[in-house]
């Protein structure tokens, strides 16, 4: 890579770090090309991205971003997984790491918060933003459904009482 290319790559990576909701750093030593391609496609399908960058360039790109605290994680063969949704990148990385022992999570960042491997793991267990919205909408709709049922119940019970009186009068 020439100097101009490196500058452009660092600028690009800096913008990525600034725009990301979360960043996960992991070792990938020993992973095959097929495994990495599979990992990249799963991350892309979930709305995230995986990049492999030189550690020195990644450290330079981190300067001036909220995720600057993770510079110490860049040692050895590291990859960067990121997404705009704070939950997507950790979730996909942890799911892939369960089935592939070559991917070892080192840590990450979510905004200004630096995360260790355990924090990334616990972040991965949280529901995504869309799932939270669906749950909230369900919680909001449930009381309305119950109120409609309570309001409709007396009318239907009243109709049953009238029907019973009508049958009683017919029988008499």
From Swiss-Prot:
GO cellular component, one term: ribonucleoprotein complex
A Gene Ontology BP annotation from the UniProt entry: translation
GO MF, any single term: large ribosomal subunit rRNA binding
InterPro entries (UniProt xref): Ribosomal_uL10, Ribosomal_uL10-like_sf, Ribosomal_uL10_bac, Ribosomal_uL10_bac_type
UniProt cross-references to Pfam families, sorted A to Z: Ribosomal_L10
Coiled coil spans: none
CDD domains noted in UniProt: Ribosomal_L10
Sorted UniProt keywords: Ribonucleoprotein, Ribosomal protein, RNA-binding, rRNA-binding
Assembly information from the UniProt record: Part of the ribosomal stalk of the 50S ribosomal subunit. The N-terminus interacts with L11 and the large rRNA to form the base of the stalk. The C-terminus forms an elongated spine to which L12 dimers bind in a sequential fashion forming a multimeric L10(L12)X complex.
Family matches, as HAMAP family: Ribosomal_uL10
The family this protein is said to belong to: Belongs to the universal ribosomal protein uL10 family.
Known role: Forms part of the ribosomal stalk, playing a central role in the interaction of the ribosome with GTP-bound translation factors.
Protein name per its UniProtKB record: Large ribosomal subunit protein uL10
Organism, as annotated: Rhizobium leguminosarum bv. trifolii (strain WSM2304)
Lineage: Bacteria, Pseudomonadati, Pseudomonadota, Alphaproteobacteria, Hyphomicrobiales
Gene name of the record: rplJ
